[in-house]
Amino acid sequence: NVDFFDPSTKLESDEKKLLQKWEINKEKKIILMPGRLTSWKGQELFIEAVNLTKIELGYEAFHVVILGSNQGRDLYKKKLVRLIEQYRLTKQIKFVNHCKDMALAYKVSDIVVSASIEPEAFGRVAVEAQSMEKLIIASNIGGSNETIINEKTGFLFESGNAHSLSKKIIKAITMDETSLKLLGKEGRKNIIKKFNVEKMCFSTYSEYKRLLN
């Protein structure tokens, strides 16, 4: 819904409240990885890439928020925590179980990552992030190939490759603000063009018509 995921509808006061709740300083870049905690969503790969990025850029360069419930997958969550501890990333990576306003979560972030290691038919995160004018970094499988214009509205990385993901994160973090905002604007234009209600209704109607004929 491009009207709900619209950056102009979010208040600065609400952004500040969310950042206070998350105990995050906005002076650093914020990388958001939304999605339930499950192995195929690629959280392990993402943590590996964050470690590689930290080695390249240093501890102080960015914050990371992994946003999503483990839905009872306690062993998997513990595995992720151990990996974070192993890489000494506990001060940099924060788990957030739930956010009732996902559009606001995107708004306070600078970069959004979708690191799925199995293809997703649609890939909602990539669409929502672009709609919120945020740079999206996603694996080059599944729906992301269709919804992201590589290097124009986001970055695609080689699926399953932590080094490839890290390179894209570093590229995003080191972009100047003007380029970052321009890329975000292109992302929203892309999503409005592809997914406005009238176009989706027409596409659905055309598909039904084709099937009936």
What are these regions (language model features)?
Residues 135-138, 148:
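Short hydrophobic beta-strand element within catalytic cores of glycosyltransferases
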Residues 1-8, 205:
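Short beta-strand->alpha-helix junction loop in the catalytic core
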Residues 20, 164, 171, 178-194, ...:
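A short, well-ordered alpha-helix in the C-terminal region of glycosyltransferases
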Residues 29, 33-55, 78, 163:
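A conserved mid-protein helix/loop that constitutes part of the nucleotide-sugar donor-binding site
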Residues 7-24, 80:
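A short helix/loop element that forms part of the nucleotide-sugar donor recognition site in Leloir-type
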Residues 34, 63-78:
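Glycosyltransferase donor-sugar binding loop
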Residues 72-77, 89-99, 105, 155-156:
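Active-site donor-binding acidic/aromatic loop of nucleotide-activated sugar
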Residues 150-151, 155-162, 171-177:
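Conserved acidic donor-binding segment of nucleotide-sugar-dependent glycosyltransferases
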